[in-house]
UniProtKB/Swiss-Prot annotation:
Residues 1-27 form the signal peptide. It comes from Rattus norvegicus (Rat). Residues 149-243, 246-339 form the Link domain. One of its GO terms (molecular function) is hyaluronic acid binding. This is Hyaluronan and proteoglycan link protein 2. Mediates a firm binding of versican V2 to hyaluronic acid. May play a pivotal role in the formation of the hyaluronan-associated matrix in the central nervous system (CNS) which facilitates neuronal conduction and general structural stabilization. Binds to hyaluronic acid. Residues 35-143 form the Ig-like V-type domain.
Amino acid sequence: MPSWIPLPAFCCLLLPWAFTVFHKTLGNPAPHPGPHYLLPPIHEVIHSRRGATATLPCVLGTSPPSYKVRWSKVEPGELRETLILITNGLHARDYGLLGGRASLRRGHRLDASLIIKNVRLEDEGRYRCELINGIEDESVALTLRLEGVVFPYQPSRGRYQFNYFEAKRACEEQDGRLATYSQLYQAWTEGLDWCNAGWLLEGSVRYPVLNARAPCGGHGRPGIRSYGPRDRSRDRYDAFCFTSALAGQVFFVPGRLTLSEAHAVCRRRGAVVAKVGHLYAAWKFSGLDRCDGGWLADGSVRFPITTPRPRCGGLPDPGVRSFGFPRPQQAAYGTYCYAEK
């Protein structure tokens, strides 16, 4: 019997083994090892409100001989992280992004959880807790999400007047900030239907449609319509703003006032004329319901409805109704005031 195997037969014997090795190498890659020292968080999304205290959990299962823990915030729409705090387990150094409102919880020696006091609108976003031990770094990511309300905003000059930077400033002037895509999506799931496109914080331009119709994106499926990439300096749209719970209180003063008289009336009560974001927050979180139009600080006249009824808004859904921007000298409305507690 010959001791050699013909080449074709040898290839046939080798092929199944080679295919098995190839399948294991490419089809079933080894799983990426998870964190060795950091425990995975029980909740990756932490919910909070403006003015509250939020805790972002980061706990070590065991302590390496030498290490540092680095907290940073991942900026939306940008490929960079902003440093917040570094600790070596004994001492911590604050880098000032949160203005001294950030500290470590230190519930025990393996606790590196981050506490953020007096949460602000700009604190919402994605955070990273990174363990640096000089051998193999590892990290966990968490998202701080604020409860709030998204509202469309345009100036007295009419629709599509803002470039990106003007839209950002306009929201801040109305006690808000530009909404993120996730905030707009959440508002859409809660009933926001709006045909005018507006800037978002990431620099995109979108609008939410619940009832698809010809003059509002066409007869397609409901969803978030997108205008694609836009020039932040040249292109002009409205703004979608986001605000959260208030530290103070919104109240209505009846009368037939001009805008300047409205400012005087609120000042006499130790308050200021409310901003648009104040009114939306009071409607959302305090259930403010009033059929009377009132002046706001931007010169618009609006009123909040939580229980729609005849001759009180004329629309079936709750929300903040607008009379637009009447002449400031027109003495026909009361005013909504805002007072800090």
